[in-house]
From Swiss-Prot:
One BP term from GO: ATP synthesis coupled electron transport
Cellular component per GO, a single term: plasma membrane
Gene: nuoN1
Record InterPro entries: NADH-Q_OxRdtase_suN/2 (IPR010096), ND/Mrp_TM (IPR001750)
Protein name: NADH-quinone oxidoreductase subunit N 1
Predominant localisation class: membrane
Record-listed E.C. numbers: 7.1.1.-
HAMAP family linked to this entry: NDH1_NuoN_1
Membrane topology: Multi-pass membrane protein
Intracellular or extracellular location(s): Cell membrane
Length: 491
């Protein structure tokens, strides 16, 4: 009888370090929750885990290392996006710390679930293979399905979770089918190997516009477009954002977008640069429709969470311009935009959390009446966040939008840059309406709703405001840093 030899695959811990460590740490936090009810311990452990994960990215900073048969990569672009996602996760945990007990929600599972979702996002950002892209998408999605229904005693939370699960499963089907079609046509799942195969097609005179290949690319982009709330795959966004617990909504609005857009950048720029004219034309239409639809529909919203949901759709359109530019300047502009949007949107949701009492959610615009008198500091912070979302200088929103529009213009996508400017002007209406309501409208309630600006939430708001002003005043520092870090993904 022949002896069987088991050969273990070589594990490159530098490549896998960030997502693997955070996944293991999430399990540790889950175990600790079994032995303590002190939520401060869980928050502290979670923040330590995020900090150590970020430090792991700095160990071999500047290197480009592939692992697991080139299915994952550790590079400067991935580390930068991962750092932004980790910072957004830390802010989410800070603003959610006092929200959970105030809403009488179990929080023991909340922290590890957020860490599980973030580990999936880090894995997705580093993915350079269709298989690992699928694993990353599903890892983050499963945790987000549970988080969406975390306030399950509330009907809207359960409804949102079911909608997100069903539509997310449908998007996963598109992703799997697209991967199958691409593999069937090229015989590869590695992004770089797919690009090499298409180069062989070109050298032998084989047409690249094969309908099966194009369908496969389209299906994968539909799945990723669902995650970033790109029109017309956005239908789930308003209902899920409204029904999910507010900290979860804040987290989903920034972190999921960042990870999915990073995967989209790798997918298009690494695997399919040969099809750039085709996907640039198609995505140009999607970007224009996404910017226009999100901003126009947001004008009619009086529910704050739905308004911010449609706003997030519009901002997905702006981020798409960075993808479409397909250049060093475009990708660096995208990373700065992601940082600015993360700080701004999390800050805006933090203000809503500060006003949200158990059984008395602050969802309507009228709930902000008189906030300037009741809590001028919160109103001032919200003003900064609204100005940044609208793109008013000297905020991070202005600097990042300017960079995105300039990158699009330099890439001969001037029509998209013009549409972006026009839709930004439209968006100023509903952002400024929030400011006017806070400062110039008196509350109609005999007993104004109290505010809950606790220490952890206040810290999160302060960090967001400082970050927004810093990026807005010193945009060149962040832009130059981003340019130095995107060389590993720009074509």
């Amino acid at each position: 009888m022949n002896d069987l030899t088991f050969i273990t695959p070589e594990i490159n811990w530098t490549v896998l370090g960030m997502p693997a460590f955070l996944m293991i740490w999430a399990m540790l936090v889950l175990i600790v929750d079994m032995f303590t009810s002190d939520r401060r311990v869980l928050l502290t452990l979670s923040l330590i885990g995020l900090g150590v994960t970020a430090a792991l990215g700095a160990l071999d900073y500047g290197s480009t290392i592939s692992g697991f048969s080139d299915m994952l990569v550790f590079d400067k672009f991935g580390v930068l996006v991962n750092w932004i996602l980790l910072a957004g996760t830390a802010l989410t945990l800070l603003i959610a710390f006092d929200y959970m007990p105030r809403q009488n929600l179990s929080q023991g599972e909340f922290y590890p679930l957020v860490l599980f979702a973030t580990s999936g996002m880090l894995f997705l950002v580093q993915s350079t293979d269709l298989v690992t892209i699928f694993i990353g998408v599903e890892t983050l999605s499963i945790a987000l399905y549970v988080l969406t229904g975390f306030a399950v005693p509330q009907f809207k939370s359960g409804e949102a979770a079911i909608k997100y699960l069903l539509l997310g499963g449908f998007a996963a089907g598109f992703l799997v089918y697209g991967i199958a079609l691409i593999y069937g046509m090229t015989g590869k799942t590695n992004l770089a190997q797919i690009a090499n195969e298409l180069s062989t097609w070109q050298s032998t005179g084989k047409a690249l516009d094969d309908p099966i290949l194009l369908a496969g690319v389209g299906f994968v982009l539909i799945a990723l477009g669902f995650k970033v709330s790109m029109f017309p795959f956005h239908a789930w966004t308003p209902d899920v954002y409204e029904g999910a617990p507010t900290p979860v909504t804040a987290y989903m609005s920034v972190a999921t977008k960042g990870a999915a857009f990073a995967a989209m950048l790798r997918f298009l720029n690494v695997a399919f640069p040969a099809l750039k004219p085709e996907w640039q034309l198609l995505f140009g239409l999607f970007a224009a429709a996404t910017m226009a639809y999100g901003n126009i529909v947001a004008v009619a919203q009086t529910n704050l969470k739905r308004m911010l949901a449609y706003s997030s759709i519009a901002h997905a359109g702006y981020m798409l311009l960075g993808v479409l530019a397909a250049s060093e300047k475009g990708i660096s502009a995208f990373t700065v935009y992601l940082l600015a949007y993360t700080l701004t949107n999390l800050g805006a949701f933090a203000v809503l959390i500060a006003l949200e009492n158990r059984g008395m959610p602050v969802f309507e615009l009228s709930d902000l009446r008189g906030l300037g008198k009741r809590s001028p500091l919160l109103a001032l912070a919200m003003t900064v966040f609204m100005f940044s979302l609208a793109g008013v200088p000297p905020t991070a929103g202005f600097a990042s939008k300017f960079g995105i529009f300039r990158a699009a213009w330099d890439a001969n996508l001037d029509y998209l840059a013009i549409i972006g400017v026009v839709t930004s002007v439209i968006s100023a209406f509903f952002y400024l309406r929030v400011i006017v309501t806070m400062w110039m409208r008196d509350t109609e309630a005999t007993e104004p709703q109290p505010t809950y600006a606790t220490a952890s939430l206040s810290l999160g708001v302060i960090v967001a405001v400082i970050g927004i002003i810093a990026v807005g005043i010193l945009p060149n520092i962040f832009t130059d840093l981003a340019k130095a870090l995107v060389l590993t993904v720009a074509p």
